[in-house]
Structure formats: C-alpha cells, structure tokens
Curated annotation (Swiss-Prot):
Regions that span the bilayer: 6-26, 38-58, 68-88, 100-120
Ways its activity is controlled: Na(+) is not transported, but it plays an essential structural role and its presence is essential for fluoride channel function.
Gene name of the encoded protein: fluC
Catalytic activity: fluoride(in) = fluoride(out)
Family as reported in the entry's similarity comment: Belongs to the fluoride channel Fluc/FEX (TC 1.A.43) family.
Keyword Transmembrane helix: yes
Entry membrane topology: Multi-pass membrane protein
Name of protein: Fluoride-specific ion channel FluC
PANTHER family the UniProt entry points to: FLUORIDE EXPORT PROTEIN 1-RELATED
Amino acid sequence: MDLREVALVLIGGGTGAVARYYLSGVLPVYRSFPVGTLLVNSLASFLLGYLYGLIFWGLDVSRESRLFLGTGFCGGLSTFSTFSYETFSLIREGEYLTALLNIFANVLATIFLVFLGFVLARR
C-alpha cells in the first residue's frame, strides 16, 4: 500500500466528512424529513457519478484525483455515493435484476442495521 495514496484518501475523506457535518447541520429538518442527509447523499452521488462519467467519456483523470475525490471526498461525504454509482453501473450494463437486488439489499440491510445498532445500544 502506497502511503501517498493513503494520505490522499485520508485528506479527501476528512474533507468530505467535514463537509457532510457542516451541510447536514445547517439545513433544517422539514416535517421530520432529514433534508441535510438527503442533500449530502445526493451531492456525493452526483459528484461520484460526474467523476466516473468524465472517466467513462474519455477524460484522463489521474489515479491520485480518483483516490482523493472519489474514494476520499465522496466516501467521506457519503458512502451512499458508492452504492448509487454501483447501482447505476449495473443499470448501464443492462443488469436490471441485479441492480434491483442491490437496491433492496442495501436499503433493507442498512435500515435493519440501524435498528439493530439502536436496539443493542439500549442494552
């Protein structure tokens, strides 16, 4: 593992996490709907899609930029961006059933794990 690459992911991830913290905190909850969370998940998904769209359409994006922006910043901003990109890739590749399974598995698993963590924290 290259320490320079690890540093890029670390700095990008920290920056993304701080952005998530700030954006989630400044936006109000609207009728119990977490607007800030929706914003950061949507923003991270858009940014990751944009980055990999640039690569897909032929722009030479360096490995360092991909690590800092994609893995680091978008990962720190929201891990949801990776899930969204992977689902989009499955759809783009015509793997509709797998994409649907990916959506249900991720959404149901994460909701279940939030519930499980909540219940276990109570003990």
